[in-house]
Amino acid sequence: MTEAKGLHSTLVVNCVLNSFLSSTAILLNIITIQALRKTPSLSKPLKTLLLSLAVSDLGVGFLVQPTYVAVLVMKIKQNAENTIFNAFSIQNFLFVFASFSGVFALTADRFLAIHLHLRYQELVTHKRVVAVVSSVWVLSALIALLALKRIQVLGFIFATIHIVCYITTGLFYCKIYAVIRHHAKQMNALQQSAQNEDMANAARLRKTLVATFYVYLVFLVCYLPRFCTGVARMHGETPLLSLLSEFSYTCVYLNSSLNPLIYCWKMRNIRQTVKNILQSIFPCGA
């Protein structure tokens, strides 16, 4: 009886949380998408990757979370409706995997920006980034369709992809940190001879690196609970795991509301554009 009450309370709490977070994800990501479109100082490859991530986060708030709330209500009423669950499964895999892949692609882009340096603009073109982003969405759609088929091995494949991406992204940032430290040691000597434009470009790159690192950290915190509970449930289901599993979904969806806040916090050009947008909407508060 206690376990049943605990599960019921968990479902209700997650209904409330996801109803609220759905609204924040929609509002914040719509503003972010508009701000990204109106920020000319961002390079096209970086803007494309950020837009893709914002669109996937908007999809989480607009489609995934409302459907998840419907699934939770269905569980509370103890009704089994396959149509709702199937819709949730497709949307969840589509947008969450696209968001997950978007963070990885963003990290890879910043790694290439600092690793290739002068060759970055030559090799990482807008067309190539668009091709990568398109491939991510196609792959996400395929995985979503496979999830609908209830293929057992899909959970193992998804867990493997998560592990590889976690490790690779961590290695990327270790390398980025090493390069930044190396550049910092040379900064005093370069400051005398480097042109102002070069110094400004270096500072801008460093700021975007810091911003994407925070995106990665928040992503890690939000996604790890879902990954851990998913792996644990492969070895058997328990009442505690059922409770934790519902909260782990909410943690993943929380990420879609936090990403826009990180952009505004750590990227001054986007923050300024957001301010301009808000001032145009609410002129009295300007």
Predicted regions and their residues:
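Extracellular N-terminal segment of 7TM GPCRs
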Residues: 1-31, 284
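Class A GPCR helix-loop hinge within the 7TM core
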Residues: 96-134
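Intracellular effector-coupling site of seven-transmembrane GPCRs
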Residues: 56, 178-226
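Structural signal for membrane-spanning alpha-helices in multi-pass inner-membrane proteins
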Residues: 32, 68-71, 75, 140, ...
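Seventh transmembrane helix
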Residues: 169, 218-231, 244-286
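Membrane-lumen (extracellular) interface motif
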Residues: 77, 146-159, 233-244
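Extracellular-loop-to-transmembrane junctions of the mid-late helices
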Residues: 139-178
